[in-house]
Regions:
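Hydrophobic ligand-binding cavity/cleft-lining segments
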Residues: 1-44
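Basic/polar N-terminal segments that are highly enriched at the extreme N-terminus
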Residues: 1-8, 146-157
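Short beta-edge strand/loop motif at the mouth of beta-sheet-based domains
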Residues: 13-14, 33-69, 156-157
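Hydrophobic/aromatic beta-strand elements that line small-molecule binding cavities or substrate pockets
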Residues: 16, 49, 72-78, 101-108
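Hydrophobic pocket/interface hotspot
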Residues: 25, 35, 59, 76, ...
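Short coil-to-beta-strand transition motifs
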Residues: 66-72, 97-100
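Short, conserved beta-turn/loop elements at beta-strand boundaries and strand-helix junctions
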Residues: 80-85
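Beta-strand/loop substructures that line and gate deep hydrophobic ligand-binding cavities in soluble
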Residues: 86-138
Length: 157
């Protein structure tokens, strides 16, 4: 996946059609037991998920991959079931001087599926944006497989 170009080159958008209801996909995104089954880039896994899914609530996901272990964490800014999540996103290995990035996840209802649209903003560089695009693409591939279909939707970029 290639990040969508922007004025600063630090925002990416990833889309995937998931063969499940919007409610089921939203739950897969907000239930720690389900998140552990799919979240993380190809070849990686989520070992632990602690999530307080409410405005002002915090989350932490501990992950493992061929690059080692790491955690992401942040705060929920908007929770609108089953339509939208907005939250801050930070890696534990990132210096404090770099501001949090922000993720918006939209769950768009289709006839027999849900289109998930992830917009990841405020990234410090194009390279970081490309790394996150790779990670989101792998995560969404695993989420689609969880529901029985790993094919990308037409027009994914």
């Amino acid at each position: 996946m290639t990040p969508a170009p922007t004025a600063k080159g630090t925002t990416l958008q990833v889309r995937r059609t998931i063969p499940a209801s919007r409610e089921a996909v939203f739950r897969a995104w907000t239930d720690p037991d389900v998140v552990r089954q799919w979240f993380g880039a190809r070849g990686g896994s989520t070992l632990h998920a602690d999530m307080d899914v409410r405005v002002g609530g915090r989350y932490r996901l501990d992950m493992e991959s061929s690059m080692g272990t790491g955690s992401i964490f942040g705060e929920y800014l908007e929770v609108t079931p089953p339509e939208r999540l907005v939250y801050t996103f930070r890696w534990d290995r990132v210096p404090v001087a770099i501001p949090d990035t922000q993720v918006t996840v939209e769950f768009l209802e289709l006839e027999a599926a849900t289109e998930v649209v992830i917009t990841h903003e405020r990234q410090p560089s194009r390279a970081v944006s490309e790394f996150h695009a790779w990670g989101w693409d792998g995560s969404l591939e695993k989420l689609a497989a969880l529901f029985g279909n790993a094919k990308e939707a037409a027009g994914d970029g």
